Design a protein with these regions (language model features):
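Substrate-recognition "cap/lid" segment bordering the active-site pocket of phosphatases
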Residues: 98, 122, 127-184, 190-199
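Short acidic-hydrophobic, aromatic-tinged amphipathic segments that line or gate anion-handling sites
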Residues: 151, 223-228
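Active-site neighborhood of HAD-like aspartate-dependent phosphohydrolases
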Residues: 2-52, 58-65
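An amphipathic alpha-helix signature
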Residues: 30, 34, 56-57, 61, ...
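Short, acidic loop-to-helix structural element flanking the phosphoryl-transfer center
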Residues: 15, 91-123
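Acidic, Mg2+-coordinating phosphoryl-transfer loop and its flanking beta/alpha structural elements
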Residues: 185-223
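Membrane-embedded alpha-helical bundles of multi-pass transporters/translocases
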Residues: 13, 64, 85-86, 209
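Non-catalytic pre-domain segments flanking phosphatase-related domains
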Residues: 1-16, 65-70, 182, 236-261
Length: 261
């Protein structure tokens, strides 16, 4: 198993979360999942559940359970609901572009990382693959990501199992292998951190999610940033020696955890 056919691993694998990290899509993402759940549950109203960091199958399953669907029926109903959610979201691509936004610094950081040899940027997200592609495409970001080697909610409903899937795909489809210190998960929730920790890789958390920086401030991520607007700080964290870079000026804006925590 070799990287780029040269018998050595590429320098960095950056696994990007989508919602709250790269972009915010407005209400369309939630409404698409709700439309799928309503289709199979036959209800006009569904319980309003927190979604941050969860996979699409997990969210729909929780919606259906909250609507009174029997747990034994989830295996047959969740795929039907997901199919409807995909259909709905595909029709709202332009709407997401109008109502949503790309978070500060994201485009510039993607450009800078793409310009560096040996840096790969797949997605690692709770979205099913089709919906992830629709969401990044709504903002013209799809060209930055190696979508076939990403890991998605339809690969496994448990987010903690997604990093190994991405690593396996990089090896099988691109011939590239990575050591844990070469891999970063970038996300905006505690579930992104748990996902990284389960695989023994590094995690950069940003405060651009629905609940802001307070939601991640106290978490033991390898690095914390309010947002990605400081490109130099983000590059220092992601590409620095041993993967730890140098702490940015400005306190929590680019705070790096020490190896001891």
């Amino acid at each position: 198993m070799t990287a780029q056919g040269q018998g050595r691993a590429a320098r960095r694998l950056i696994l990007w979360d989508v919602d709250g990290t790269l972009v915010s899509c407005g209400p369309a993402g939630r409404e698409a999942l709700e439309s799928g759940a309503r289709l199979v549950a036959g209800l006009a109203a569904l319980p309003h559940l927190p979604m941050g960091g969860k996979t699409d199958p997990q969210i729909i399953g929780e919606m259906l359970l909250g609507a009174g669907v029997a747990p034994a029926d989830l295996g047959s109903l969740v795929p039907v609901a997901l199919a409807e959610a995909k259909r709905a979201l595909a029709g709202w691509r332009e709407r997401m572009g109008r109502e949503g936004k790309v978070h500060p610094g994201v485009r510039r950081l993607l450009d800078e990382l793409a310009a560096r040899g040996g840096v790969r940027q797949p997605l690692l997200t709770g979205n099913v693959a089709v919906n992830a592609a629709i969401k990044v495409g709504a903002f013209g970001l799809e060209g930055y990501f190696d979508l076939p080697v990403g890991a998605y909610g339809d690969d496994n409903a448990q987010r903690e199992l997604l990093v190994p899937i991405a690593l396996d795909r990089m090896r099988e489809l691109r011939g590239e292998t990575y050591q844990p210190e070469q891999v970063w998960v970038i996300g905006d929730t505690a579930r992104d951190l748990s996902c990284a920790r389960a695989a023994g890789v590094r995690c950069l958390l940003v405060g651009t999610g629905r609940d802001g920086f307070d939601a991640v401030r106290g978490l033991e991520a390898d690095a914390l940033m309010e947002n990605l607007a400081d490109t130099g700080a983000a590059l220092g964290i992601l590409l620095g020696r041993s993967g730890r870079g140098a702490p940015a000026a400005g306190g929590a804006r680019g705070r790096l955890r020490s190896p001891g925590g």
